[in-house]
Amino acid sequence: MLQKHPEAPPVAYDVIVVLGAAVWPGAQPSPALQRRILHAVDLLQRGYTTYLLVTGGVGKYPPAEAAVMQRLAVAHGIPPQHVLCEAQATSTFESALLCCDMLRQRGWSRVLLVTDRYHLPRALFAFWSCGLRAVGSAAPGKPARRLWRRWYYYLREGLALPWYLVRAVPVLLQRRRQAVEPQSTTRP
């Protein structure tokens, strides 16, 4: 389910997961990163949840995307203990795997996923592949000014979906096997 700006009364989510984007030199957030975290902060302040989980490792420039988002969230009034970080992932699929493990450990399953509109279908697919039924909320923003740039983003996402399917199937099968196989016990 895709929501541009949820207008209905807030639904209680366990957490908002915010996917990272580029960090620029000097630890500056790219416009996409800033859009995503500010949208998540707005949703949290409007009562959709009390926790953020920011995800993203180190890209071309340090620090980790998650660290930059955490700093921005705290600067906008979110208590530090309410901003969880996953700072290892280097792809959307890795973010999904690592975040899903963190969420399961906390018993959280009601997730609002924040990213850009063009990225949301693939991001939701990645989280669904890990067994988490997230709801998407696209960060508001202007589409790319140049038509070729917009086409580039949509083409890249369209080509990435089949690749994710290839990556997701083995992960799903492995997780199913682990869930079905009895735990081995050793006898003294």
Sequence positions of predicted segments:
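A structural signal for short, hydrophobic/glycine-enriched beta-strand patches
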Residues: L2-W151
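N-terminal membrane-anchoring alpha-helices
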Residues: M1-V11, W163, R167, Q174-P188
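A transmembrane-helix-recognition feature enriched in membrane-embedded lipid enzymes
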Residues: L147-R177
